[in-house]
């Protein structure tokens, strides 16, 4: 994987008013010709909400718990990232061309930028939502280590941008709410990161039911064990350690950092939390979604 040297810290590029990583914004043109297949399964999240975790769970389900098969390639190749693009690397769409059915694919795109083919084909979607405070903290550390993002600045200024929807992929509030609304008219299984942390087996059973598959209980237990944070953090096929340091610098922050609920409490000041709570109440007024800040 050779990357040319201009990957570092490009400013965000706005598409339909939504800020995106520059290279991903440039991939949206070619993405218009992407054709979804009815048996595709889309994993959708706002960044830092459990995408890699659920990708690995689903690949293990598709491989019927066969760990060897899930070691065939890094998770970002096994579950192509729809809008991914970076200099010198195959795009997500290029990877999908070589992926046999039934395909797993992932996206962070808000609905305004999602290829229409996915909705036209009634592709099943598994959406994972995570509480906004933990997302903000995790996203800040991800910005720091993944150099395709703009410079994150200080935590204080990053939090302000996050609240204003001025980070890559835009507003968390809009993202979680619009995909929730879609779940009323489209085949979307809407899951919560906190629920998977609390009882992964229960949530995996929901996934199996949604995709119309069944596995022996011992296989499900095996999947739970293999997709624990501890296991995935040390697995080179899931921890992104195969990505060049020029793109992701794990010495700044690990891709798989803590994987817990409530980490925001170690980062938010009292004043930041009060400001965030007031802003959150306004942005989520009238929304039926309820998030847990700790377990």
Curated annotation (Swiss-Prot):
<feature type="binding site">
    <location>
        <begin position="255"/>
        <end position="259"/>
    </location>
    <ligand>
        <name>3'-phosphoadenylyl sulfate</name>
    </ligand>
</feature>
<keyword id="KW-0808">Transferase</keyword>
<feature type="binding site">
    <location>
        <begin position="48"/>
        <end position="53"/>
    </location>
    <ligand>
        <name>3'-phosphoadenylyl sulfate</name>
    </ligand>
</feature>
<comment type="subunit">
    <text>Homodimer.</text>
</comment>
<dbReference type="GO" id="GO:0008146">
    <property type="term" value="F:sulfotransferase activity"/>
</dbReference>
<dbReference type="GO" id="GO:0042403">
    <property type="term" value="P:thyroid hormone metabolic process"/>
</dbReference>
<dbReference type="GO" id="GO:0042420">
    <property type="term" value="P:dopamine catabolic process"/>
</dbReference>
<feature type="modified residue" description="Phosphoserine">
    <location>
        <position position="138"/>
    </location>
</feature>
<protein>
    <recommendedName>
        <fullName>Sulfotransferase 1A1</fullName>
        <ecNumber>2.8.2.1</ecNumber>
    </recommendedName>
</protein>
<dbReference type="GO" id="GO:0008202">
    <property type="term" value="P:steroid metabolic process"/>
</dbReference>
<comment type="similarity">
    <text>Belongs to the sulfotransferase 1 family.</text>
</comment>
<dbReference type="GO" id="GO:0051923">
    <property type="term" value="P:sulfation"/>
</dbReference>
<dbReference type="GO" id="GO:0005829">
    <property type="term" value="C:cytosol"/>
</dbReference>
<dbReference type="GO" id="GO:0005737">
    <property type="term" value="C:cytoplasm"/>
</dbReference>
<feature type="active site" description="Proton acceptor">
    <location>
        <position position="108"/>
    </location>
</feature>
<feature type="binding site">
    <location>
        <begin position="227"/>
        <end position="232"/>
    </location>
    <ligand>
        <name>3'-phosphoadenylyl sulfate</name>
    </ligand>
</feature>
<keyword id="KW-0128">Catecholamine metabolism</keyword>
<comment type="function">
    <text>Sulfotransferase that utilizes 3'-phospho-5'-adenylyl sulfate (PAPS) as sulfonate donor to catalyze the sulfate conjugation of a wide variety of acceptor molecules bearing a hydroxyl or an amine group. Sulfonation increases the water solubility of most compounds, and therefore their renal excretion, but it can also result in bioactivation to form active metabolites. Displays broad substrate specificity for small phenolic compounds. Plays an important role in the sulfonation of endogenous molecules such as steroid hormones.</text>
</comment>
<feature type="binding site">
    <location>
        <begin position="106"/>
        <end position="108"/>
    </location>
    <ligand>
        <name>substrate</name>
    </ligand>
</feature>
<keyword id="KW-0597">Phosphoprotein</keyword>
<dbReference type="InterPro" id="IPR027417">
    <property type="entry name" value="P-loop_NTPase"/>
</dbReference>
<keyword id="KW-0753">Steroid metabolism</keyword>
<keyword id="KW-0443">Lipid metabolism</keyword>
<feature type="binding site">
    <location>
        <position position="193"/>
    </location>
    <ligand>
        <name>3'-phosphoadenylyl sulfate</name>
    </ligand>
</feature>
<feature type="binding site">
    <location>
        <position position="138"/>
    </location>
    <ligand>
        <name>3'-phosphoadenylyl sulfate</name>
    </ligand>
</feature>
<dbReference type="InterPro" id="IPR000863">
    <property type="entry name" value="Sulfotransferase_dom"/>
</dbReference>
<dbReference type="GO" id="GO:0050656">
    <property type="term" value="F:3'-phosphoadenosine 5'-phosphosulfate binding"/>
</dbReference>
<keyword id="KW-0963">Cytoplasm</keyword>
<dbReference type="GO" id="GO:0004062">
    <property type="term" value="F:aryl sulfotransferase activity"/>
</dbReference>
<dbReference type="Pfam" id="PF00685">
    <property type="entry name" value="Sulfotransfer_1"/>
</dbReference>
<feature type="binding site">
    <location>
        <position position="130"/>
    </location>
    <ligand>
        <name>3'-phosphoadenylyl sulfate</name>
    </ligand>
</feature>
């Amino acid at each position: 994987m050779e990357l040319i040297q201009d990957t570092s810290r490009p400013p965000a590029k706005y598409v339909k008013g939504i800020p995106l990583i520059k290279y991903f914004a440039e991939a949206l043109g070619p993405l218009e010709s992407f054709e979804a297949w009815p048996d595709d399964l889309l994993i959708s999240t706002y960044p830092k909400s459990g995408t890699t975790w659920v990708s690995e769970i689903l690949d293990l389900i598709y491989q019927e718990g066969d760990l060897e098969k899930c070691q065939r390639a890094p998770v970002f190749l096994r579950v192509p990232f729809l809008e991914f693009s970076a200099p010198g690397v195959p795009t997500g769409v290029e990877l999908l061309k070589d992926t046999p059915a039934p395909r797993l694919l992932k996206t962070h795109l808000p609905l305004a930028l999602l290829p229409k083919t996915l909705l036209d084909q009634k592709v099943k979607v598994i959406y994972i939502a995570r509480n906004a405070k933990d997302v903000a903290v995790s996203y800040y550390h991800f910005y720091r280590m993944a150099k395709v993002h703009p410079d994150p600045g200080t935590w204080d200024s990053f939090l302000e941008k996050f609240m204003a929807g001025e980070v890559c992929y835009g507003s968390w509030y809009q993202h979680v709410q619009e995909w929730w609304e879609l779940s009323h008219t489209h085949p979307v299984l809407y899951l919560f990161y906190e629920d998977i942390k609390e009882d992964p087996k229960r949530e995996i059973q929901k996934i199996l039911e949604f995709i119309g598959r069944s596995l022996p209980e011992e296989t499900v237990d095996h999947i739970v064990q293999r997709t624990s944070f501890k296991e995935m953090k040390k697995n080179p096929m899931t921890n992104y350690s195969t990505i060049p340091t020029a793109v992701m610098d794990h010495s700044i922050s690990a891709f798989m950092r803590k994987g817990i609920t409530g980490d925001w409490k170690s980062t938010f000041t009292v004043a930041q939390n009060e400001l965030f709570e007031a802003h959150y109440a306004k942005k989520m007024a009238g929304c039926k979604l309820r998030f847990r800040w700790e377990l």
